[in-house]
């Protein structure tokens, strides 16, 4: 049995009783990485020397100062490689940032460091978080621990795979259109996209600034709540972070959902959703009914426009955000330039991968003078309609529930030839980002040995309710206890 089969609160108790040390936890992480990393390939950079030194420092602190410390104290964590870490290489899985060492920490890293968490390393992802399979990484292919011939999802594929494989007890990811929830579903773990503004984006390398959110990927709902508790809250360094009180999320995990009203959008169980996935969700709803909740079918009529809206808006924002990677200040610079303009052009042509180039071109086109109103402005108007759909449903219901993804994990290489089939994989998660509301994916079944995710969506800043529902479901089932046979 691995130490990481325990919940974080249980590991915390073992530390308090001196039955294990912080060094034991870090050793366990690197031991497991040594066993499975060659197969899974979740990490881009390991932080072994610093992690072991910090573990020793925290063990000394424990010996001198006793047990008065938070639940994350001494816990190993993996960090998605688009969150800047002072002195630890941050690449966004892109050749253009292959040698970038940040000189400051993201706000979430400062908060984790203050809580005593220990960074084990930086995790693989789709380049600049653009993708749904982690196949767009500029460096390596991460594999799904449940089936090494399949993708782990994306763009936070490294984060989900590392947690599922037991390399770390938890990890941070980022979610722009499903990039935490979709890989969490594919890898059979718990992934939360918080409300937009709940967690500071300062130090998150921007893809689409109006959509990006950092969030936790964990083995259990309780662990997820502990991690969000530490990273959530107002940050003066991020003008979009919200001045909304952060409740005690763990206290919300009462197991009581009697009288809870669930909305199930017919659009989320219709065309394109695999029958076995649909059945897993209907079975999950029966479990929630037994626990005292009720559900009704509703409509989110503008969801069918979400995919097109998202790709116009996200690509437009990416076009602007990625203009800073020009070879002048940091990162990759071409050796073949004849002049300054040529240097910009060659650096970006050689440094960016195909998917990033595709989205930059799409966004630049959508923002161009003759097409701005027809594409970008119209997409913003449709985004408002999508948001209003959610607001209308939430007037009557507490949460919205459906599948996280239309299918379980697909085979490596299966969708790389056709960007549109790849994009369609996020069709159920994208509306949540456009509306800015929180959503969580929890394991709810298996299809041919592959995990299926249940998506629970809540009102703005009401992560507590979706945690309560997710936890009640988790405690009534044992899907979260299943582990891949690595």
From Swiss-Prot:
The active site is at residues 80, 155, 179. One of its GO terms (molecular function) is ATP binding. It catalyses: L-glutamyl-tRNA(Gln) + L-glutamine + ATP + H2O = L-glutaminyl-tRNA(Gln) + L-glutamate + ADP + phosphate + H(+). Signal peptide: none annotated. Pfam families: Amidase (PF01425). InterPro entries: Amidase, Amidase_CS, Amidase_dom, AS_sf, GatA. Its EC number is 6.3.5.7. One of its GO terms (cellular component) is glutamyl-tRNA(Gln) amidotransferase complex. GO terms for biological process: translation. Allows the formation of correctly charged Gln-tRNA(Gln) through the transamidation of misacylated Glu-tRNA(Gln) in organisms which lack glutaminyl-tRNA synthetase. The reaction takes place in the presence of glutamine and ATP through an activated gamma-phospho-Glu-tRNA(Gln). This is Glutamyl-tRNA(Gln) amidotransferase subunit A. The gene is gatA.
């Amino acid at each position: 049995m691995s130490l990481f089969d325990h919940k974080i609160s249980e590991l915390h108790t073992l530390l308090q009783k001196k039955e294990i040390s912080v060094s034991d936890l870090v050793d366990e992480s690197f031991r497991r990485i040594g066993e499975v990393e060659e197969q899974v390939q979740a990490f881009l950079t390991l932080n072994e020397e610093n992690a072991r030194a910090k573990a020793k420092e925290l063990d000394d602190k424990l010996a001198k100062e006793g047990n008065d410390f938070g639940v994350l104290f001494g816990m190993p964590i993996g960090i998605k490689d688009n969150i800047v870490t002072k002195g630890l290489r941050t690449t966004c899985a892109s050749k253009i940032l292959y040698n970038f060492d940040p000189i400051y920490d993201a706000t979430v890293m400062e908060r984790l460091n203050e809580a005593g968490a220990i960074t084990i390393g930086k995790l693989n992802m789709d380049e600049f978080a653009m993708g749904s399979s982690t196949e767009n990484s500029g460096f390596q292919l991460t594999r799904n621990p449940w089936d090494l011939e399949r993708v782990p999802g994306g763009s936070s594929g490294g984060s989900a795979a590392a947690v599922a494989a037991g390399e770390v007890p938890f990890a941070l990811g980022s979610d722009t259109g499903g990039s935490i929830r979709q890989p969490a579903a594919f890898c059979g773990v718990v992934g939360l996209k918080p409300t937009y503004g709940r967690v500071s984006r300062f130090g998150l390398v921007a893809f689409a600034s109006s959509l990006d959110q950092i969030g936790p990927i964990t083995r259990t709902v309780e662990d997820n709540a502990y991690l969000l508790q530490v990273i959530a809250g107002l940050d003066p360094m991020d003008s979009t972070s919200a001045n909304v009180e952060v409740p005690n999320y763990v206290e919300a995990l009462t197991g009581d959902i009697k009288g809870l009203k669930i909305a199930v959008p017919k659009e989320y169980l219709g065309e394109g959703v695999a029958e076995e996935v649909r059945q897993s969700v209907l079975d999950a709803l029966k479990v929630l009914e037994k626990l005292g909740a009720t559900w009704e079918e509703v409509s989110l009529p503008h969801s069918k426009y979400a995919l097109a809206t998202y790709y116009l808006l996200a690509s437009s924002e990416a076009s602007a955000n990625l203009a800073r990677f020009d070879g002048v200040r940091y990162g990759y610079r071409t050796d073949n330039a004849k002049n300054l303009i040529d240097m910009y052009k060659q650096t970006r042509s050689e440094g960016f991968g195909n998917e990033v180039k595709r989205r930059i071109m799409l966004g630049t086109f959508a923002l161009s003078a003759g097409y701005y109103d027809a594409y970008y402005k119209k997409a913003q108007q449709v985004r408002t309609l999508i948001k209003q759909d959610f607001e209308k449903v939430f007037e009557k219901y507490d949460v919205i529930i459906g599948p996280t993804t239309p299918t379980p994990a697909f085979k490596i290489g299966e969708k790389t030839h056709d960007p549109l089939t790849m994009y369609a994989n996020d069709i159920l998660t994208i509306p949540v980002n456009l509306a800015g509301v929180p959503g969580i994916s929890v394991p709810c079944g298996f299809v041919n040995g592959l995990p299926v995710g249940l998506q629970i969506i809540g009102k703005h800043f009401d992560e507590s309710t979706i945690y309560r529902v997710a936890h009640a479901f988790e405690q009534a089932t044992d899907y979260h206890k299943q582990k891949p046979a690595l």
